[in-house]
Structure formats: C-alpha cells, structure tokens
UniProtKB/Swiss-Prot annotation:
Any GO BP annotation: conversion of seryl-tRNAsec to selenocys-tRNAsec
Known EC number: 2.9.1.1
SUPFAM superfamilies tied to this protein: PLP-dependent transferases (SSF53383)
Pathway where this protein functions: Aminoacyl-tRNA biosynthesis; selenocysteinyl-tRNA(Sec) biosynthesis; selenocysteinyl-tRNA(Sec) from L-seryl-tRNA(Sec) (bacterial route): step 1/1
GO molecular function: identical protein binding; L-seryl-tRNA(Sec) selenium transferase activity
Cofactor: pyridoxal 5'-phosphate
Keyword check for Protein biosynthesis: yes
Catalytic activity of the protein: L-seryl-tRNA(Sec) + selenophosphate + H(+) = L-selenocysteinyl-tRNA(Sec) + phosphate
Residue positions, PTM N6-(pyridoxal phosphate)lysine: K285
Taxonomy of the source species: Bacteria, Pseudomonadati, Aquificota, Aquificia, Aquificales
Keywords, in A-Z order: Cytoplasm, Protein biosynthesis, Pyridoxal phosphate, Selenium, Transferase
Gene3D superfamilies for this protein: 3.90.1150.180, Type I PLP-dependent aspartate aminotransferase-like (Major domain)
Role of this protein: Converts seryl-tRNA(Sec) to selenocysteinyl-tRNA(Sec) required for selenoprotein biosynthesis.
Listed name of the protein: L-seryl-tRNA(Sec) selenium transferase
Length: 452
C-alpha cells in the first residue's frame, strides 16, 4: 500500500503535463482532488493500481472549467419554474441585451441635452402607457419594491393589512419580516379566512400611514372566505386620506381571459383603473421579462419613492433594464407571441400534441425505450395562478434496463441538462415547456446516454 501511495504523481509533474493545454489554476486543483481521491481509495483497500489517473485529472479539469450556471432544457411543464430561472426571455430581448452589453450606452445620459439623465426614463413611458399609471419606478425585484414602498411611506408608522394576506413569498421571505425590516409597523386585521372593510376601518388611527393588500399569488382559499375588494379599499383610503398599496405579485400586464385562460388574476392596468394609489409586481413571472420589481401609481408617491436613499441600493442594472425595456416594447406593440411565457401559457392542445408526436417519432429508434404520448396537466409555476392547471401533452418513456430515477439523474447531469418529471416509473417530457429547437437535443442526449 505504501509503495502504491508513493507512486501517486507529484502535483508539479501533473502541471507540466497539462499546463500548455489548460490554465494552471484548474490543473493544480484537479490534480490535488484526484490525488486525494486515489489516496483515500488505496488506504481503504478499494484501489490496487493507478490506472486512469491522468485521464481522471483531465476529466476533472474539464469539469472545473465549465460555468456553474448552465442553460437547462425544462421538460417539467412548470412554465415559470423558479428553480430553473423563471421566465425565459424573448430572442429580441436577448439580442438587445447583448447589443447594450457589447459597449457603452446612454444608460444615464440624455443625448438630446448632452447631460446626465435618468435610467428609469428609458422604460417609464412604456410602463405608464401599459398600466395607465401617472408614474412608475423599477428596482431589482418585487421584494425590494415592497420594502421600498413601506420604508418610504410608512417608516415608524402603521400599515394595515389582512391577516390572511401575510404571505410567504418563497425562500422563507415573509411579508411581516419585510415590513419589520422596512421600519413599518404591522397592524394585522381580520382573520385568516375572512377580512372585511370594517376590520380595516376599525384599525385606522392617527399613526396609520398605509392601507395594504397582498395578492395571494402562490395559494388560494375557497369555502367560507371573504376578502376586501380593491375598490372598497380605495373608497376607504379616500375617506380618511390614507394611501392604498397593492402588491400584485406576478406582474401581469394583460387580461388572460382574452387569451382563453379563465382566471381572476389581477393585472396592473385593472388595479390602477380601480384607483389604487400604488401597485407593485415582479418582472420575471407572468410579465415574462427579467427579474425586476415594478412600482406604478400616483406621481406624488412615486416621486417620494425615487428620492429614498435606499432606492439606490435596490437599483436595477443596465442589462436588466435593457431586457425589461425590450420586453415592455413587445407588449406595447402587442407582440405577445414573441414573449415565451405568454406563448407557453397560451399554446393550444393541438400544437402541443403535434410537438409530442414529433418527439415520439425522433425517439422511436433508440433501443430499449418504450415510448408513448399521454395527455396531462401542466402548471404556470413561479407562485402564480396556483389554482390553474393547463392541459398538456407529454412524451412518456421507460427504459428496459435503467430505472426512471437513474435516467432522470443522467439527464440532469448531461450537457445541456434536461429536467423532467417522473410519474408511475415513467419519465415525462412535458411539451408545454419544451421548445421546438430542443427536440433534437433531447434525442441526441438520450442516444448518447443509453449507448454507454
């Protein structure tokens, strides 16, 4: 054993072998990790020789050199998959981001006047037009938007909100926690399942700064329930001269019912038309753009928010801003089909079945696979439209040698990774979230994995 341990190549010698081919920092790290692995296996009696040492080092080098964030093929059927990066961006958006990233830009420069300008001005006209708001502002995400609104308008003062709307918005971030950090004082009213206008009104006092509602975007309640309507909250706010604020969550810019999706999901324009003073939402959920926190509403309130020093800490960067501008431009031009999230949500069953049949045909010649096309249900995801199930078609496969769990694992570790779902020991590729251009990649990946 000692003799074999002494034969493990020195790190410096391994570096000499690979230094012309790979950056030294990766070679050193890979050589050390592989040497340690071999040393441990020899001591434990699991290894009797050093065969394959250099090959293992080179494989490790290549693995270390790959970026950690990878493009993933989403075959889960969850359209706004938070773990997989939420909304995929339009090709127009991607090209525009690339163009802006590839040099300098007029991010904060007024070309007409030749002096400093505002970065938000680039998208404000789109947001105001699309939502009907007097003014608008954008920060890095919607949790930041909620924090900024509360800190600006209610620091040291009370914010009245329904107990049933004190939601957790994911990643253990909870509305009460954000409110506490903002300096606002939580005044919860009503019960978990029932809150009335009288509950809000009964809690109003001289220290009340804001009447707030939060859209329950990631769950829904039914049965013996009641919540305060936005229009009633507006009337109450007007009666006492207190601003109203609605966290709409998903950032919807259109009426989904016009696209055949029968859900009562609030969109920015409808909320503003009801008279809510401020509305906020996410950029990378139902809106289908990059991550951002969008705030629209009354100009006097937005101006206060813009002047808050914390706004700079939550500032949106130029690439996100570029992506958001182009996404909003697509909405402005009514090019909804070019927005991937909207396109995926509104795909008809016939198109999904055709896509499934095409993948089935591509996979039929791969040995050992049992393939079928099945009808199933997909989900919007991203903490949006929790009650909605979308009809979809899946290609279901089962291998005669590998379990579905093992095949799923191998697909996740492939290049590019492919993430599916498993049901009844079948691997399902949901066509609602698989792009046409990914079908041949799925075939090629399965061929390579199953030929090993």
């Amino acid at each position: 054993m000692k003799s074999l341990l002494r034969q493990i190549p020195q790190i410096s010698k391994v570096v000499e072998i690979f230094k012309k081919k790979y950056p030294e920092i990766y070679v050193v790290k890979a050589a050390r990790e592989v040497a340690e692995k071999y040393r441990k296996e020899i001591i434990e009696g699991k290894r009797k020789d050093l065969n394959g040492f250099l090959e293992d080092v080179e494989r490790k080098i290549k693995s270390l050199m790959k970026p950690n964030i990878k493009r993933v093929i989403n075959a889960t059927g969850v359209v706004i998959n938070t773990n997989l990066g939420r909304a995929p961006l339009s090709k127009d958006v991607i090209n525009f981001i690339s163009e802006i990233a590839n040099g300098y830009s007029n991010l904060e420069y007024n070309l007409e006047e030749g002096k400093r300008g505002s970065r938000i001005a680039h998208i404000e006209k789109y947001l105001n037009e699309l939502t009907g708001a007097e003014s608008s502002f954008v920060v890095n995400n919607n949790a930041g938007a909620v924090f900024l609104v509360l800190n600006t308008l209610a620091e040291g003062k009370e914010v009245i909100i329904s107990r049933g709307e004190l939601v957790e918005i994911g990643g253990s971030f909870r509305i009460p926690d954000i409110m506490k950090k903002s300096g606002a004082i939580l005044r919860e009213v009503g019960t978990t399942n029932k809150t009335k206008v009288s509950d809000y009104e009964g809690a109003i006092n001289q220290n009340t700064a804001l009447l707030m509602k939060v859209h329950k975007s990631n769950f829904y309640m039914e049965g013996f329930v009641e919540e305060v309507k936005l229009e009633d909250l507006v009337k109450l706010g007007h009666k006492y001269g207190i601003p109203t604020y609605y966290d709409a969550g998903s950032g919807l810019l259109i009426n989904l019912k016009e696209f055949g999706i029968s859900v009562d999901e609030p969109n920015f324009r409808d909320c503003i038309s009801l008279g809510i003073d401020l509305v906020s939402g996410s950029g990378d959920k139902l809106l289908g753009g990059p991550q951002a926190g969008i705030i629209v509403g009354k100009k006097n309130l937005i101006e206060k928010i813009k002047k808050n020093p914390i706004a700079r800490a939550l500032r949106i960067d130029k690439l996100t801003l570029s992506g958001l501008e182009m996404t909003l431009k697509l909405y402005f031009e009514k090019r909804y089909e070019d927005i991937p999230v909207i396109r995926m949500l509104t795909q008809d069953e016939k198109a999904l079945r055709q896509k499934a049949k095409r993948l089935e045909k591509l996979l039929k010649d791969i040995p050992g696979l049992k393939i079928s096309v099945i009808k199933d249900k997909a989900k919007p995801g991203g903490g949006s439209l929790p009650e909605l199930e979308l009809p979809t078609y899946c290609v279901a496969i089962r291998h005669d040698r590998l379990s579905s769990q093992e095949l799923s694992r191998r697909l996740r570790l492939a290049e590019p990774p492919i993430v599916c779902r498993i049901r009844e020991d079948q691997l399902l590729f949901d066509m609602r979230t698989v792009f046409h251009e990914d079908l041949k990649t799925i075939k090629k990946t399965l061929q390579e994995l199953l030929s090993i």
